Amino acid sequence: MEVIQYPNSPFKLHQPFPPAGDQPTAIAGLLEGLSDGLAYQTLLGVTGSGKTYTMANVIAQSGRPAIIMAHNKTLAAQLYAEMREFFPENAVEYFVSYYDYYQPEAYVPSRDLFIEKDSAINEHIEQMRLSATKNLMTRNDVIIVATVSAIYGIGDPTEYQQMVLSVKEGDTIEQRDIIATLVSMQYERGDLDFKRGSFRVRGDVIDVYPAESSENALRISLFDDEIDRLDMFDPLSGSLIQRVGRYTVFPSSHYVTPRDTVLRACESIKEELRERIEFFAREQRPVEQQRIEQRTRFDLEMLYEMGFCKGIENYSRHFSGKKEGEPPPTLMDYLPDNAIMFIDESHVTVTQIGGMYKGDASRKQNLVDYGFRLPSARDNRPLKFHEFEKVMPQTIFVSATPAKYEEEHAGQVVEQVVRPTGLVDPQIIIRPVATQVDDLMSEINDRIEKGERVLVTTLTKRMAEQLTDYYSELGIKVRYLHSDIDTVERVEIIRDLRLGLFDVLVGINLLREGLDIPEVSLVAILDADKEGFLRSHRSLIQTIGRAARNVNGVAILYADKITDSMKAAIDETERRREKQIKFNEEQGIVPQQIKKQVKDIIDGVYHEEDGSKGRLKGKNKVKVGEIHNEEDAIKEIAKLEKAMQQAARDLQFEEAAVLRDRIRDIKENLLFGAE
């Protein structure tokens, strides 16, 4: 492993091997585009060509902070794990939604049903979010891996920075002033329960457990009114780690606000409330008039007394001082001016970013219309797409199949078609639809004999289920991947396929970007000639690419005619194959099969979340004694949580509460080391 630091770059790249294939030219091309000031570029990188490694090299050589956007938590976790391996000495951060479970506030007029906001916050993810913003403000060697959570409103960066507590050995400051500052930063005093986001006082010593810290706490030792020494210590064992000359404690929430800002916001909220009460009075809607007055006055009382209230984000416009309709502050406002943005799998992510605002707006409108929220609540929202475009730094779109937006905006397209391993795109074979099930059966048997795996994609859920049942009856080990399966279970199914616990995976939308299964040597696309979203040329290229990580990779398209989408996908795949084969011949490269260790792609990130990804009916409860280890506990929690969410959706709140308590028992007794 070679460690490389380029001139004027704060990044130390741990390079397992030098760039190969198309990587060197792609890296040089992207760096040239950045230095030429191109606002948008596209990295057209085929499956398995090492796009993440190329991104890491561009970041290391440019020396600029970076944000990498992904379209789901699984892909973000995969990128985060890889970037941490490339940059273990730099600040690689993870910024995704910190909700394990989130039921937004909503009102259903037809049933006169108001649904209170309910959520379960994952403390580990919250700590990582706070760590991300802290490092953006204090370091220049930062890489943030984020989902669309980055375009949702968080606290204003200017006010967030005003609320820090900076301490230095030798400073003169009274103990009560330190305590008052910590309380205003929403730290809790916890002399008995010392946890993240709390502090405790013992004589002249104040221990602070910073909200963004995953393992170390700060000890402030005072002598009279002077800071005598500062030490970092292990909050679990109490052992000292190192003495520090100075330290900056950041707020325990992104929504912390100075007292004068809170008071100013309260006056502004009162004014809006008065206008809203008058509006409902004119409209002769006494129920809504009473509702908005009662709810808002309660929130105002909490703000005056505590400085925050439940649902404080709905008043964010009053706190930030922005005008109606102006974009809220987001993570994008924390980025330094010289940052670079990578949008991974941009053909999906760009569309996803564009769709976030409208879904949020329609729900908020009902709350406003029926007096549950003031109209300013509509400004607590994700960015609209044109607002996102305005705050985008220099951007590199990364995709094997760039969409129309990238094609229209990219100043240049850099191709990364040749893989470092010498693997070429799979050979495409077209066969008739009439015999597709039986023909595929014989192909599957061939692959099973060789110890290889098969992906089968169908058009409908019914077809997928019938095919799975049919092959299963014939003795083939087959599983069906469908939309009801949550993120963690999906990762487990893919891991089981790689381990050979079953040989065939059937699904409807198996083009899932980032699906990395080197053992798959055959991708079968049934009814490939039916035009539509699942059989568009981009979907076909993505699906065919799932076999590109295997030296014997083949894609069989079952079709009676060649559609425009099929032709485009076949032509593009053949173009890439020709280029790859030619390069291999010129360089004397023999394609090498990828041998990739089977492990959880989300090591270090998702195990914290495993305990909150799915739920099981109360009647299926398992006694604590039947759970023997942490792995059993995690699986049991996953089942219980799936059932809890379903019970909540079915309005079976008593059952949901029982399941919630059961989950808490397992976590306390097993996951956190009961005696």
UniProtKB/Swiss-Prot annotation:
<comment type="similarity">
    <text>Belongs to the UvrB family.</text>
</comment>
<keyword id="KW-0547">Nucleotide-binding</keyword>
<keyword id="KW-0067">ATP-binding</keyword>
<keyword id="KW-0742">SOS response</keyword>
<dbReference type="GO" id="GO:0005737">
    <property type="term" value="C:cytoplasm"/>
</dbReference>
<comment type="function">
    <text>The UvrABC repair system catalyzes the recognition and processing of DNA lesions. A damage recognition complex composed of 2 UvrA and 2 UvrB subunits scans DNA for abnormalities. Upon binding of the UvrA(2)B(2) complex to a putative damaged site, the DNA wraps around one UvrB monomer. DNA wrap is dependent on ATP binding by UvrB and probably causes local melting of the DNA helix, facilitating insertion of UvrB beta-hairpin between the DNA strands. Then UvrB probes one DNA strand for the presence of a lesion.</text>
</comment>
<dbReference type="InterPro" id="IPR001943">
    <property type="entry name" value="UVR_dom"/>
</dbReference>
<keyword id="KW-0234">DNA repair</keyword>
<dbReference type="Pfam" id="PF17757">
    <property type="entry name" value="UvrB_inter"/>
</dbReference>
<feature type="binding site">
    <location>
        <begin position="45"/>
        <end position="52"/>
    </location>
    <ligand>
        <name>ATP</name>
    </ligand>
</feature>
<dbReference type="Pfam" id="PF00271">
    <property type="entry name" value="Helicase_C"/>
</dbReference>
<keyword id="KW-0228">DNA excision</keyword>
<dbReference type="InterPro" id="IPR024759">
    <property type="entry name" value="UvrB_YAD/RRR_dom"/>
</dbReference>
<feature type="domain" description="UVR">
    <location>
        <begin position="634"/>
        <end position="669"/>
    </location>
</feature>
<dbReference type="InterPro" id="IPR001650">
    <property type="entry name" value="Helicase_C-like"/>
</dbReference>
<dbReference type="GO" id="GO:0003677">
    <property type="term" value="F:DNA binding"/>
</dbReference>
<keyword id="KW-0267">Excision nuclease</keyword>
<dbReference type="Pfam" id="PF04851">
    <property type="entry name" value="ResIII"/>
</dbReference>
<protein>
    <recommendedName>
        <fullName>UvrABC system protein B</fullName>
    </recommendedName>
</protein>
<dbReference type="GO" id="GO:0000715">
    <property type="term" value="P:nucleotide-excision repair, DNA damage recognition"/>
</dbReference>
<dbReference type="GO" id="GO:0009381">
    <property type="term" value="F:excinuclease ABC activity"/>
</dbReference>
<comment type="subunit">
    <text>Forms a heterotetramer with UvrA during the search for lesions. Interacts with UvrC in an incision complex.</text>
</comment>
<feature type="short sequence motif" description="Beta-hairpin">
    <location>
        <begin position="98"/>
        <end position="121"/>
    </location>
</feature>
<feature type="domain" description="Helicase C-terminal">
    <location>
        <begin position="436"/>
        <end position="602"/>
    </location>
</feature>
<feature type="domain" description="Helicase ATP-binding">
    <location>
        <begin position="32"/>
        <end position="417"/>
    </location>
</feature>
<keyword id="KW-0227">DNA damage</keyword>
<dbReference type="InterPro" id="IPR036876">
    <property type="entry name" value="UVR_dom_sf"/>
</dbReference>
<dbReference type="InterPro" id="IPR041471">
    <property type="entry name" value="UvrB_inter"/>
</dbReference>
<dbReference type="GO" id="GO:0009380">
    <property type="term" value="C:excinuclease repair complex"/>
</dbReference>
<dbReference type="GO" id="GO:0016887">
    <property type="term" value="F:ATP hydrolysis activity"/>
</dbReference>
<keyword id="KW-0963">Cytoplasm</keyword>
<dbReference type="InterPro" id="IPR006935">
    <property type="entry name" value="Helicase/UvrB_N"/>
</dbReference>
<dbReference type="InterPro" id="IPR014001">
    <property type="entry name" value="Helicase_ATP-bd"/>
</dbReference>
<dbReference type="InterPro" id="IPR004807">
    <property type="entry name" value="UvrB"/>
</dbReference>
<dbReference type="GO" id="GO:0005524">
    <property type="term" value="F:ATP binding"/>
</dbReference>
<dbReference type="InterPro" id="IPR027417">
    <property type="entry name" value="P-loop_NTPase"/>
</dbReference>
<dbReference type="Pfam" id="PF02151">
    <property type="entry name" value="UVR"/>
</dbReference>
<dbReference type="Pfam" id="PF12344">
    <property type="entry name" value="UvrB"/>
</dbReference>
<dbReference type="GO" id="GO:0009432">
    <property type="term" value="P:SOS response"/>
</dbReference>
